[in-house]
Amino acid sequence: MTANTTPGKAFPVSWDQFHRDCRALTWRLNETGPFHAVVAITRGGLVPAAIVARELGVRVIDTVCIVSYDHNQKSELKVLKDISDATAKLGGGTGKGLLIVDDLVDTGATARVVRAMIPDAHFAAVYAKPLGKPLVDTFITEVSQDTWIYFPWDLDLAFAPPLRDGAA
C-alpha cells in the first residue's frame, strides 16, 4: 500500500485483541515444541515473540531484521541483521528446534528469506494472508490479501467514521 492508495479493507487490532491472538498462537505452539529459542522478525515480530517466549518459557530470544517497507511503500528486501551464530548453532545450523515469530505473513517474501536462513525452523505468525499462508507452519487468523492490518503500535486514539456514508 502506498501513501496514495487505500487498502481494500481495514482491520484495526487493539492491544487486548493482539494479546489474546498471541496467547492463542502460543496454545497451538505448545503442542509443537519444545523450542530452544525464539527468533523475532523485526520489528513486527518483537511484540508477539515476547508474549510467545514468556508463555512457552523460552529464555533465548534473537532477532532477524529484514526491511520490506519504507513507510507504507513496499520496497526491495534487505537484511539489516542476521540471526546470531549462537542461535543458529542451537538449531544445528538448519533451525531445528527454533521458532520464528512474526506479526503477519503477507506475500511471503520476508518468510522466504528467513526460511532460506534456517529451513527447519518452525514459522509462526499471528495473522496470515493467502499469498503468505503456505510459508507458515502455525497462525491464528487469516485475512484477505487486500486487507490492511492496523497494529496497535501503529495507531493513536482518533475519531472513527461510520462504515456507511451518512450513518452518523
From Swiss-Prot:
<dbReference type="Pfam" id="PF00156">
    <property type="entry name" value="Pribosyltran"/>
</dbReference>
<dbReference type="GO" id="GO:0004422">
    <property type="term" value="F:hypoxanthine phosphoribosyltransferase activity"/>
</dbReference>
<feature type="binding site">
    <location>
        <position position="103"/>
    </location>
    <ligand>
        <name>Mg(2+)</name>
    </ligand>
</feature>
<dbReference type="InterPro" id="IPR029057">
    <property type="entry name" value="PRTase-like"/>
</dbReference>
<dbReference type="GO" id="GO:0006166">
    <property type="term" value="P:purine ribonucleoside salvage"/>
</dbReference>
<feature type="binding site">
    <location>
        <begin position="43"/>
        <end position="44"/>
    </location>
    <ligand>
        <name>5-phospho-alpha-D-ribose 1-diphosphate</name>
    </ligand>
</feature>
<comment type="subunit">
    <text>Homotetramer.</text>
</comment>
<feature type="binding site">
    <location>
        <begin position="106"/>
        <end position="110"/>
    </location>
    <ligand>
        <name>GMP</name>
    </ligand>
</feature>
<keyword id="KW-0997">Cell inner membrane</keyword>
<keyword id="KW-0660">Purine salvage</keyword>
<comment type="similarity">
    <text>Belongs to the purine/pyrimidine phosphoribosyltransferase family. XGPT subfamily.</text>
</comment>
<dbReference type="GO" id="GO:0000310">
    <property type="term" value="F:xanthine phosphoribosyltransferase activity"/>
</dbReference>
<keyword id="KW-0479">Metal-binding</keyword>
<dbReference type="GO" id="GO:0032265">
    <property type="term" value="P:XMP salvage"/>
</dbReference>
<keyword id="KW-0328">Glycosyltransferase</keyword>
<dbReference type="GO" id="GO:0052657">
    <property type="term" value="F:guanine phosphoribosyltransferase activity"/>
</dbReference>
<feature type="binding site">
    <location>
        <begin position="148"/>
        <end position="149"/>
    </location>
    <ligand>
        <name>GMP</name>
    </ligand>
</feature>
<comment type="pathway">
    <text>Purine metabolism; GMP biosynthesis via salvage pathway; GMP from guanine: step 1/1.</text>
</comment>
<comment type="function">
    <text>Purine salvage pathway enzyme that catalyzes the transfer of the ribosyl-5-phosphate group from 5-phospho-alpha-D-ribose 1-diphosphate (PRPP) to the N9 position of the 6-oxopurines guanine and xanthine to form the corresponding ribonucleotides GMP (guanosine 5'-monophosphate) and XMP (xanthosine 5'-monophosphate), with the release of PPi. To a lesser extent, also acts on hypoxanthine.</text>
</comment>
<keyword id="KW-0460">Magnesium</keyword>
<feature type="binding site">
    <location>
        <position position="106"/>
    </location>
    <ligand>
        <name>xanthine</name>
    </ligand>
</feature>
<protein>
    <recommendedName>
        <fullName>Xanthine-guanine phosphoribosyltransferase</fullName>
        <ecNumber>2.4.2.-</ecNumber>
        <ecNumber>2.4.2.22</ecNumber>
    </recommendedName>
</protein>
<dbReference type="InterPro" id="IPR000836">
    <property type="entry name" value="PRibTrfase_dom"/>
</dbReference>
<keyword id="KW-1003">Cell membrane</keyword>
<comment type="pathway">
    <text>Purine metabolism; XMP biosynthesis via salvage pathway; XMP from xanthine: step 1/1.</text>
</comment>
<feature type="binding site">
    <location>
        <position position="149"/>
    </location>
    <ligand>
        <name>guanine</name>
    </ligand>
</feature>
<dbReference type="GO" id="GO:0005886">
    <property type="term" value="C:plasma membrane"/>
</dbReference>
<dbReference type="GO" id="GO:0032263">
    <property type="term" value="P:GMP salvage"/>
</dbReference>
<feature type="binding site">
    <location>
        <begin position="102"/>
        <end position="110"/>
    </location>
    <ligand>
        <name>5-phospho-alpha-D-ribose 1-diphosphate</name>
    </ligand>
</feature>
<feature type="binding site">
    <location>
        <position position="106"/>
    </location>
    <ligand>
        <name>guanine</name>
    </ligand>
</feature>
<dbReference type="InterPro" id="IPR023747">
    <property type="entry name" value="Xanthine_Guanine_PRibTrfase"/>
</dbReference>
<keyword id="KW-0472">Membrane</keyword>
<dbReference type="GO" id="GO:0000287">
    <property type="term" value="F:magnesium ion binding"/>
</dbReference>
<feature type="binding site">
    <location>
        <position position="149"/>
    </location>
    <ligand>
        <name>xanthine</name>
    </ligand>
</feature>
<keyword id="KW-0808">Transferase</keyword>
